[in-house]
């Protein structure tokens, strides 16, 4: 196979002239006593050499060979790393199989990113100092020919290029709010600028404040052949070291290490010597590299998922991820050992390349192929993101495991526990079961390449079910409103988040615990009620119509009101006063005539109270209502004014658009029509037909351009005694009461 000398990268291995080298294993032998380890066998061979020490010292040619190099790389792939170190395809295969133990600067090959959020740029510095080689005349004078009969080596080192290399690996993590591409570009610019920065007096570096701020978030990992008192860990430390690197080897030339070696085939010296029968094809090596890169991506994704708070918050999700990681780790190790087992056998002629192809086929057909691994990780990520989205708005509420929940339930100072419970986190994962089953199969243990595929049962994940998601959203809305807006200051009520397996309530449910016992597994807290209807306003009283809400059990109402001062704005002024009532029809009394009041109410359930309704504003007065006028202040505010100054308002923001309807004392409304907008989600227009004393009719209307179908209103006698509206950011409902 290799019938002529060739060169190979040292990779931090102590390779020196006259050392024996085995290309089957890609290992070297010391001239006296050496040990090498295979997958299953450990061999100890002593006293192996071709020449004595005296001959070697007399026939070694040494001369200076000075060269420096500086390169940058933004890639973390093994291919780009191998290119920087000038690693051959064959040596790369041995590294992937774990047959080569690297050292010094070559440890860079083992340094891979641990997270997808990690941006990385590498600076590579190299210099060579001298070149040593055995003279060709000495090669023919073999003093110990018995080495050829032992067949433990295939080559001998005839020349070594010495020097030193260094890799400075710069990393920067990007947060969820930062774009990784921007961080990567910023890091790349700063690393490439590093050689150009100058260090001035007292060690200060000439750079802008923005550049200094960027460097604060950059970390550095050093892999090198230089002897340092301390490795750099920051950008600034790396900058200082870079300025010193050219002097380190110059001042201490004895510290140079092998960078590259030249190997001479032993069978050219004696036909009986072992030789490299065949080499692994480049395409197969490329396939091995692709598989290992894919498994590395899987490992990074696992690391990112394990850092998500939700993983540790819920034991079921944590156990599934750990199970996946354990199975994955075992498989990756055994796969690597399988590759390591067949490589030497193929190179030595004991096996054909087909044995390696079979291992790769076995991988592609296994449940550990990249597509299946990534699909499971995608599902796991979806589940965790769903949990995170449901808890991030509830940061003030603790997430409790079963022990924490029991501790709270046993607390004598807590009467009621309201728990947002995730009910579907505990389940049997068929894919994880398949992974475990595959790892215990005979075919996996043998890894003989026979195609063996375990079927993975397809199952619909609970977190991909739209009906379940809809229910979870509703539960979250009820729970959040019940806690954040209404009852967070209630000392006797504790709000928590937990997980309890409950197939009857998939997704989530609100659990109610009273006196330490579960009393309702589908608790529906009282929700925000509709706007109160103002039925009548007199000098010191306001009559209200309160409305039940379908969500939750209504026990009482709590009517809240306060006076609004002229200079205080709508939401300011005095504190809210409140009165409890059991009746839907309720009259506020002892109000001051002529002053404006804001009124709202809450529904009181058996546990806690609801969020407050939207407010209505009214001004008690002793005079009759008289003539009225309807005014739209904006799309989300309506006011009704009466001739005596009385006013009723729906909505809360004043604006510029305005339309006024003026009615006289004896005017009668003959017909009324309302229109929704074209989207059917807002009030789009209204029209009144008015008849005066002389039976003359006129039309008063305000309409948007795009309308839906009209809705006719029964005006009965033509006298309007009430207006009802509902608003949020806009008026979305409007109605009139006629008698």
Predicted regions and their residues:
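Beta-strand-rich modules
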Residues: 588-607
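Lectin-type carbohydrate-recognition ectodomains
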Residues: 135, 556-559, 579-580, 611-614, ...
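Pro/Thr/Ser/Gly-rich low-complexity, intrinsically disordered linker/stalk tracts
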Residues: 521-552, 613-625
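Exposed aromatic-hydrophobic patches
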Residues: 585-591, 661, 711
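Extracellular low-complexity, O-glycosylation-prone stalks/linkers
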Residues: 541-585, 602, 609-615
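Long, compositionally biased eukaryotic scaffolding/regulatory segments
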Residues: 297-300, 304-541, 566
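Membrane-permeabilization and membrane-interfacing ectodomains
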Residues: 1-357, 362, 395, 442
């Amino acid at each position: 196979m290799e019938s002529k000398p060739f060169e190979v990268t040292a990779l931090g291995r102590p390779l020196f002239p006259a050392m024996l080298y085995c290309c089957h294993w890609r290992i070297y032998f010391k001239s006296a006593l050496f040990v090498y380890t295979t997958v299953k066998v450990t061999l100890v061979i002593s006293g192996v050499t071709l020449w004595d020490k005296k001959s070697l010292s007399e026939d070694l040619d040494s001369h200076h060979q000075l060269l420096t190099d500086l390169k940058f790389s933004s890639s973390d792939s093994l291919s780009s790393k191998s290119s920087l170190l000038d690693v051959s395809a064959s040596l790369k295969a041995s590294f992937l199989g774990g047959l080569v133990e690297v050292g010094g600067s070559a440890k860079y090959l083992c340094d891979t990113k641990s997270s997808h959020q990690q941006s990385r740029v590498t600076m590579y510095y190299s210099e060579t100092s001298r070149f040593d080689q055995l003279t060709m005349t000495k090669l023919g004078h073999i003093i110990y020919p018995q080495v050829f009969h032992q067949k433990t080596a295939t080559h001998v080192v005839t020349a070594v290029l010495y020097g030193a290399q260094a890799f400075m690996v710069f990393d920067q993590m990007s947060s969820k709010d930062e774009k990784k591409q921007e961080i990567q570009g910023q890091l790349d610019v700063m690393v490439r600028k590093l050689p150009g920065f100058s260090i001035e007096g007292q060690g200060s570096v000439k750079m802008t404040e923005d550049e200094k701020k960027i460097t604060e978030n950059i970390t550095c990992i050093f892999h090198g052949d230089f002897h340092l008192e301390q490795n750099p860990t920051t950008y600034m430390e790396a900058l200082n070291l870079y300025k010193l690197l050219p002097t380190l080897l110059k001042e201490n030339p004895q510290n140079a290490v092998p960078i590259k070696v030249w190997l001479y085939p032993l069978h050219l010296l004696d036909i009986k010597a072992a030789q490299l029968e065949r080499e692994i094809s480049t395409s197969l090596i490329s396939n091995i590299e692709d598989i290992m890169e894919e498994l590395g991506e899987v490992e990074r994704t696992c690391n990112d998922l394990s850092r998500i708070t939700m993983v540790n918050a819920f034991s079921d999700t944590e156990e599934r991820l750990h199970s996946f990681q354990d199975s994955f780790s075992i498989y990756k190790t055994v796969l690597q050992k399988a590759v390591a087992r067949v490589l030497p056998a193929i190179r030595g002629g004991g096996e054909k390349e087909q044995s390696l192809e079979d291992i790769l086929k076995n991988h592609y057909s296994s449940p550990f192929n990249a597509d299946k691994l990534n699909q499971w990780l995608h599902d796991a990520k979806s589940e965790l993101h769903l949990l995170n989205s449901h808890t991030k708005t509830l940061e003030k509420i603790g997430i409790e495991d079963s022990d924490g929940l029991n501790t709270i339930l046993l607390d004598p100072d807590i009467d009621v526990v309201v728990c947002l419970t995730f009910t579907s986190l505990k389940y049997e994962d068929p894919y994880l079961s398949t992974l475990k089953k595959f790892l215990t199969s005979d075919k996996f243990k043998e890894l003989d390449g026979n195609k063996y595929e375990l079927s993975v049962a397809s199952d619909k994940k609970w977190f991909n079910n739209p009906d379940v998601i809809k229910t979870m959203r509703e539960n979250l809305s009820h729970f959040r409103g019940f806690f954040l807006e209404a009852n967070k200051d209630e000392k006797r009520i504790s709000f928590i988040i937990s997980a309890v397996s409950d197939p009857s309530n998939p997704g989530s449910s609100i659990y109610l615990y009273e006196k330490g016992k579960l009393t309702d597994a589908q608790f529906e807290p009282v929700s925000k009620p509709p706007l109160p209807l103002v039925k009548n306003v007199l000098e010191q009283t306001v009559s209200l119509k309160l409305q039940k809400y379908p969500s939750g059990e209504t026990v009482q109402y709590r009517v809240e009101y306060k006076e609004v001062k002229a200079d205080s704005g709508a939401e300011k002024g005095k504190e809210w006063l409140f009165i409890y009532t059991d009746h839907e029809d309720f009259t506020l009394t002892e109000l001051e005539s002529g002053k404006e009041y804001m009124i709202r109410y809450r529904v009181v359930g058996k546990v806690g109270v609801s969020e407050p309704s939207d407010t209505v504003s009214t001004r008690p007065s002793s005079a009759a209502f008289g003539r009225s006028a309807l005014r739209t202040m904006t799309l989300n505010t309506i006011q009704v004014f009466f001739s005596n100054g009385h006013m009723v308002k729906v909505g809360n923001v004043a604006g510029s658009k305005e339309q006024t309807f003026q009615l006289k004392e004896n005017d009668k409304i003959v017909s009324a029509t309302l229109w929704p907008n074209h989207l059917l989600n807002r009030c789009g227009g209204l029209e009144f037909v008015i008849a005066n004393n002389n039976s003359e009719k006129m039309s008063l209307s305000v309409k948007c351009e795009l309308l839906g179908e009209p809705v006719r209103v029964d005006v009965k006698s033509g006298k309007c005694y009430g207006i009802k509206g509902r608003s949020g950011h806009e008026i979305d409902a409007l109605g009139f009461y006629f008698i």
